[in-house]
């Protein structure tokens, strides 16, 4: 079949099981080939081919609503809804988004990127449907990893109480990104081996009604029998206790089982949970045999060998540098512990976990719990390192305020993937943390200019005993600078001048320092002497240096790879105002007030104007006409 010619999923309605199985093979081959060039979330999508096809065969999208939790497993859905020709642009600038996108297709009714939101979304859609009096099916698809998120459990509780008609698909592959952890994961394991409870329950009810004379009485006790069966046949029938009709577990790669159970679910009143067992990476051996999450999401790869195609890094990854330095210090300090919300691989904590298994805590998709747990461990004299992506730190904001900062707990927050992250797009860009962290009392916030300063900042953070401290660092690899052998402490709230200058000052930090220096060197050719300051402490700022700069009266440009509203530049404006310096020219560069789409970091920086050319232009505009010796001089 020509998969690129698919316009909508209606063609599935008349296909036989044999034809569907052949289609599945073709879809898998298409994904393996296409993603080998573009990269993407291959493991999750290979695992849901039959499930996605069966859903589109049995339901009528977009009238019936599919809500893909997290959304990285929606590639097959995109293919079946007419976007095959765009797969060559997957996750590229102005190309096909790697997650559901409402502006992309009417079949994408709910946008995702973070986990555990689909059930709340489904409850909202079901409530709206019932108020409007329409009859569409609401079908959230959630993984066993996402089900560990507190928000998902809150929604399960509410849905079961409201008894709204919906069909929850539990896609159970025993992994989210890394192997799942926790009691809910263990409970699902028991369900996988418990047999088909629903079938037995229905058969017994049927038999009761067939018995002469006493059949009616027995049928009347069917509910009590059902309750007994729950405990006799399925240990820990969690979902039934919450008010769901539980179906399964079923083979997520068997069209016979999927279609039979989906048809049964459509006839069942109230909330139904269909427990589907799938194999992540099915059909491609390297992904199918992955046990740690390497093939969850990848860059380009060689199909025949499974080798990843990427240039050899000249420097270690930022995640590896930070976790490695924490591990190094943990050898000397038994108080140091590491906490991650389901990202041990991405945060490069495998080495720490292997060396210190009793001091490593993967709490699952539970950012709020992770933050509060870190605060409590700090209260008991430990030195917690909370490794968390910038985009996921948003989910723990209240706990950072209420439990960590309010109690002035000695927690080191490693804010990974800070700044633009590229291909994962607007749900994953790490651009909000400065704005929502710098206004919290007791918080220290910093970002290094390179990996050498980064290792010293880790040492500074784990040596700091006066409250919470956070270090943001970007995705990807360091610059390859020479590394000091001896770790040292950087005085809190101190900046450094990287390049002297007497005509203007650039205040920046982290990834934007390089473009600032390059812009200053370009302006030097025009006779402008521009100072570049490594403003490595975002909070507290270096007040002594700032007062000196303001006293000089030099124009100031701030640059940050983060949102402007409430960001670092705002803090400089506030400080100047508080010092009564109303006449110093101050300009700010950063992320504009909108969500930044997917694409390469280079393309995105170009689009929003964060380039050395634009930095130079902004400095030129700040200068009094007589100072600028460039064009027209």
Curated annotation (Swiss-Prot):
Mg(2+) binds at residues 144, 173. Belongs to the transketolase family. DXPS subfamily. The gene is dxs. It comes from the Bacteria. Pathway: Metabolic intermediate biosynthesis; 1-deoxy-D-xylulose 5-phosphate biosynthesis; 1-deoxy-D-xylulose 5-phosphate from D-glyceraldehyde 3-phosphate and pyruvate: step 1/1. GO terms for molecular function: 1-deoxy-D-xylulose-5-phosphate synthase activity; magnesium ion binding; thiamine pyrophosphate binding. It catalyses: D-glyceraldehyde 3-phosphate + pyruvate + H(+) = 1-deoxy-D-xylulose 5-phosphate + CO2. This is 1-deoxy-D-xylulose-5-phosphate synthase.
